[in-house]
Amino acid sequence: MADLISYDDAIDAAYDIFLEMAPDNLEPVDVILFTAQFDDRGAAELVDISDDWAGHVGFDVDKEIYAEVRIGLVNEENDVLDDVFARMLISRDPDQKFCHILWKRD
């Protein structure tokens, strides 16, 4: 197996994919909100991989090879990322590129 990409690089890749795909997968109002408030409240955070991913992707997720990134807006009062626009599962193996996104739905 190849060397895994760093968690920082996984976050960067997830954010780039999010920006490219958000206009086609989020409500227009959410795209406007995220764009307008990202500089002040936006975040792309690495989190512990949730156990529900196997049900979404159809295979057992190796928590050493994959990373979960959440992208959204942080609540200014408690500094918690609580307005999540996308949950992303991304492979850190450069030879096995994979990304699955769960988008915010109203």
UniProtKB/Swiss-Prot annotation:
InterPro entries: dsDNA_mimic_put, Put_dsDNA_mimic_sf. It holds the Pfam family DUF440. It comes from the Bacteria. NCBIfam families: PRK05094.1. Belongs to the putative dsDNA mimic protein family. May act as a double-stranded DNA (dsDNA) mimic. Probably regulates the activity of a dsDNA-binding protein. HAMAP family: Put_dsDNA_mimic. This is Putative double-stranded DNA mimic protein VV1_3059. It comes from Vibrio vulnificus (strain CMCP6).
